[in-house]
Design a protein with these regions (language model features):
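Loop-to-transmembrane-helix transition segments
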Residues: 5-15, 59-87, 150-158, 197, ...
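Glycine-/small-residue-enriched transmembrane alpha-helix faces in small-molecule transporters
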Residues: 1-35, 87, 144-171, 295-300
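Helix-helix packing/entry segments at the starts of transmembrane helices
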Residues: 14, 37-39, 100-106, 169-190, ...
């Protein structure tokens, strides 16, 4: 695969992820968030299992110590993913697809904030990037003083968990095959979502074929296929380029929200989106100064 083909594959992935916010919002009109997450992440895990099976011959046998590491890692990552998608689905009911896409993109800004707490050192300019992104959030959300709309607040909490999830993935996934790791964390997320659905008394019955359509497209295309595209694309595209390409996810979400749902971005909100995107992109140029670089295990 050439670099141009790889970049195109990652751009397609960003488009799939950004556009899928429309389906996530429409799904909330006919079903509840926890059972929706339970079904789509379980379906995604099942879709990835054949890929893992046919590639198993190229992977070394996992040692017992790595099995324990895999278990702890996937439970941690899957739990963080559960909280991230739970807050995201609850929040998207109360806000627009455009806001969801751009606020979710702030996970890139949360990474250095969390990293500092873990002892990572950053270029001081990273705080300028964070300030720019936060200014954009203020404009996009139409905040009155320190008050933020409930839906946007839930999406912001979701972005925090996505940032934490990214740090955990960076710390542990380099020791394991990416598809195997993904399957396990998707199952953990799906199981926890099912428990949450039971505890909160959600209906476990999908009310219509329309609901199954949203589940299948999200589970098969956005999660399973999107993740696979990401893995193959990042085998060729450098991390810095990949991060820039993935930042377009927010743009695709805004375009999808405007085209499919008739959402409107006012001038203040549009400026906020640009500031958030700019702050997130700026944050990409200041990685931790004292953090090791890791590589994912190859699929081949």
């Amino acid at each position: 695969m050439t670099l141009a083909q790889s970049n195109l594959l990652l751009l397609l992935t960003a488009a799939m992820w950004g556009s899928s916010f429309v389906l996530q919002k429409m799904a909330m009109d006919i079903m509840e968030p926890f059972i929706y997450n339970a079904l789509r992440f379980t379906l995604a895990a099942l879709c990835l299992m054949p890929i893992r099976y046919f590639r198993r011959g190229n992977i070394d046998v996992i040692k017992s110590t790595d099995k324990r590491h895999m278990l702890i890692g996937t439970i941690s990552a899957g739990t963080l993913m559960f909280f991230a998608v739970a807050f995201q689905q609850i929040g998207i009911k109360e806000t627009t697809v455009s806001n969801t896409g751009f606020i979710t993109g702030l996970y890139i800004v949360f990474v250095p904030m969390i990293g500092v707490a873990l002892g990572h050192k950053y270029n001081p300019k990273i705080w300028l990037a964070i300030l720019i992104a936060c200014s954009g959030l203020y404009l996009l959300s139409g905040m009155d003083g320190l008050y933020m709309k409930k839906g946007d607040l839930f999406i912001l909490i979701s972005a925090f968990f996505w940032g934490t999830h990214l740090i955990v993935i960076d710390m542990i996934s380099h020791r394991h095959h990416p598809i195997a790791f993904a399957i396990r964390q998707f199952f953990v997320c799906g199981i926890l979502s099912l428990f949450a659905a039971l505890i909160t008394g959600e209906s476990l019955i999908v009310p219509s074929m329309e609901g199954w359509f949203y589940i299948c497209i999200s589970g098969v295309v956005a999660i399973a296929l999107g993740y696979t595209f990401q893995i193959y694309g990042q085998k060729v595209t450098p991390p810095s380029q990949a991060a820039l390409i993935f930042s377009t996810e927010a743009v695709f979400s805004a375009v999808a929200g405007i085209y499919f749902l008739g959402e409107v971005l006012g001038s203040k909100a549009l400026i906020g989106c640009l500031l958030m995107l700019g702050g997130s992109l700026m944050a990409q140029f200041y990685p931790p100064l004292n953090h090791r670089m890791t590589e994912q295990k190859s699929l081949s």
